[in-house]
From Swiss-Prot:
The protein's name: Probable endonuclease 4
Job of this protein: Endonuclease IV plays a role in DNA repair. It cleaves phosphodiester bonds at apurinic or apyrimidinic (AP) sites, generating a 3'-hydroxyl group and a 5'-terminal sugar phosphate.
Keywords carried by this UniProt record: DNA damage, DNA repair, Endonuclease, Hydrolase, Metal-binding, Nuclease, Zinc
UniProt family annotation: Belongs to the AP endonuclease 2 family.
Binding positions for Zn(2+) 3 per the UniProt entry: 182, 229, 231
Amino acid sequence: MKRVGAHVSASGGVEQAPLNATAIGAKAFALFTKNQRQWKAPKLSKATIEAFQKACADGGFQPQHILPHDSYLINLGSPDPEKLERARSAFIDEMQRVADLGLQLLNFHPGSHLKEISEEASLLLIAESINMALEATNGVTAVIENTAGQGTNLGYRFEQIAFLIDRIEDKSRVGVCLDTCHLFASGYDLSSTEAIETTFNEFDSTVGLHYLRGMHLNDAMQPLGSRVDRHASLGKGTIGMAAFTFIMNHPACEEIPLILETPNPDIWSEEIALLYSLQQVD
């Protein structure tokens, strides 16, 4: 089964997220387990954890269909030793929160070199950061998200993601989330069935489709290779619908969270229904 959902609000407590997902007809969801603009948050209470798990069970959401995202403040490739230490500590805390909720995945943007060190030096710091977090926690997979390559963000080429995975000690606990807008912005064409098939094949040969743990389904505001991270509603941007039809019929996308981060939450239920309508019956 394809598991389509959206990055829903957890305002009022994480237990609200599965309720918000159910309300839009989602079969998966993403959330922040804390305020994504803050470094610290109180530990999740037993009551909150139990309420979250009950809401997930009631909505039919399994842990592998839920894709928590870490704080935007965290830069695991920071050239500043003090900031790097803070980022690593915060990332471990995010992983522990995911584990406390009984979940299995933590989606994150790799990091940025900030023009102060080389791309490779920053990638080595990111790999080291991931290894440290996996060592300090149990049961949670680090899910690397490809980026649009905006500014000095790394992870915009499949080769960079492969570089990171090659250096992860426990490869059973590393995966990838592919964002369609980011792919297109970073130069991977998705604008036709042939184009996205070529991109998927390149990902498979460079990284491996067996590492795919989730996707973010977003159209793009800017043209191919723009390196600008601006999401558009499905069919309203520069990617077009062929890519989403391909994804909704690709076996590698079975039973993983396929998450909308499109700009209009009011039409998420319609976009979810649209995606399911693209499935071809055998």
